[in-house]
Amino acid sequence: KKLKLTRDKENLNFYLKSNNFVKYKYFSLLPSGKYGHRLVIDIYLDKKSKKIPETQKVIKNSKVVIAIDAGHGGKDPGAVGKKGTLEKDIVLSISKKLYALLKKEKNIKPILIRNKDSYMTLRQRIKKARRHKADLFISIHADAAKNKKAKGSSVYVLSQHGASSEAAKWLANKENSSDLLGGASIDDKDNELAQVILDMSQSVTIETSLKASRIMLKNLNKVSKLHLKNTGQAGFVVLKSPDIPSMLIETAFLSNAKEEKKLRTKKFQKNIAKAIKDGILEIIRKGII
């Protein structure tokens, strides 16, 4: 029900208020990699408690919010095909088709990050998704490569390296860090504590993104050959929201003449949109988000 962290000169205090009986275990971890000493607390709902938590009631009656991000836009055309096809136009068309398909689902609320040929910074896209309290963020793109024979679809999520460097940027904004920490009051002296919590949140989000991406790849493979059979990971800024599972989908290669031609057709755009929709439905059905 409520979580609060405070610190005095000697102690770090952790308060948890719950409507249900809970059990907990705690243990410490020695320094590893970029992390120092850590305290891990696992909290379990006691089997004796039959009351359904209020949060579960809310989730059951609320819609799953899917943020659909059409890459590039406005002054940023993205990749340009040999025939002059602009990535920003293709991905907006696919995004609108996906939006229309998801709109028909009773338990889903789709959000278009951009619904016209407009320019948005990568961080503006993240902010809009967070403002709408998105449960899943999907950025749609069309790939390009020096190798003109490169083809197929790919799915990427954030890498751990990208996450660690991003955490410092998020913490630079006091309002963002407070919001991401669930409203906990953390002053300037507690940035190290906030960093640990934010890193933990990012790690969980990346793990969720990876699980979701594998399902998405399986569904994309039904309508398109895969360029990468496994999920790719990189430091895409648009995927760096610490609290929203996110993935970037490269639908096909505009740099490949055959795939450029395919990307321009309504049939392929509809097939890709449907595959993404089916992937989202499976992700929800399996309780990943």
Positions of the model-derived regions?
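Short beta-strand motif preference
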Residues: 14, 68, 247-249
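Catalytic-core regions of hydrolytic enzymes
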Residues: 48-193, 202-214, 218, 232, ...
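Structural motif
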Residues: 38, 65, 135, 244-246
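Short, well-structured beta-strand/strand-turn elements
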Residues: 20-31, 106-113, 117, 227-229
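Signal-peptide-cleaved, periplasmic/extracellular N-terminal interaction regions immediately downstream
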Residues: 1-66
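Active-site-adjacent mobile loop/cap segments within catalytic or ligand-binding domains
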Residues: 41, 197-289
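Flexible glycine-/small-residue-rich
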Residues: 18-20, 43-45, 70-72, 140-142, ...
